[in-house]
Amino acid sequence: MSGVVFPGQAPVDLDIYQSSYMIDYKPYGKHKYARVTSEVQAKLDTQLRDKEFYRPTPSPNPKLEDGYPAFKRPHMTAKDLGQPGFFPPQGRVGPVEDEWRFTSTCPSVYPASHALYLAHGDPNRIQQSADFPCLLEPEHQPAPDVGKGYFLLPGCACTYHCTVKVPILNRWGPLMPFYQ
């Protein structure tokens, strides 16, 4: 009775219908598979092995539109997070007398020395030094193609930069226009 086909049934093509108990089913017959030579099979095996052990290197400059996994790099440091004072410069390049110069192009600049800074004005102000530059100056802004999707918080407490508008991140879409 196993080979009998009833009138309401049609013969089942096993290449089309494969159920879960036919996991190991391999079709046999001259039209069911393509012949592969041993050289081609070895080449395909090496390609597959390279693909299995290939670890894609993440971009060194992740963007926000790439999604959160772009920021899971194991080699991300505080420099990548934009905290320039976390790693003070290793060696001074200029002469020693340049050390006490004003280090910012901001209209409300602070001297690099703490004593000069206290003599300069309000002690409640944030100290601006070479290790903590003002992030709103043009040289610290990202390039137009790199900075897409980012916004920098103000790094300077001066009145000039407090009037600068900061883009607000819209939760349901892209960055909203600048407003205050």
Curated annotation (Swiss-Prot):
The lineage of its organism: Eukaryota, Metazoa, Chordata, Craniata, Vertebrata. This is Protein SPMIP9. InterPro entries: SPMIP9. One of its GO terms (cellular component) is cytoplasm. Its main location: nucleus. Keywords: Cell projection, Cilium, Cytoplasm, Cytoskeleton, Flagellum, Nucleus. It is found in: Nucleus; Cytoplasm; Cytoplasm, Cytoskeleton, Flagellum axoneme. One of its GO terms (biological process) is flagellated sperm motility. Microtubule inner protein component of sperm flagellar doublet microtubules. Microtubule inner protein (MIP) part of the dynein-decorated doublet microtubules (DMTs) in flagella axoneme.
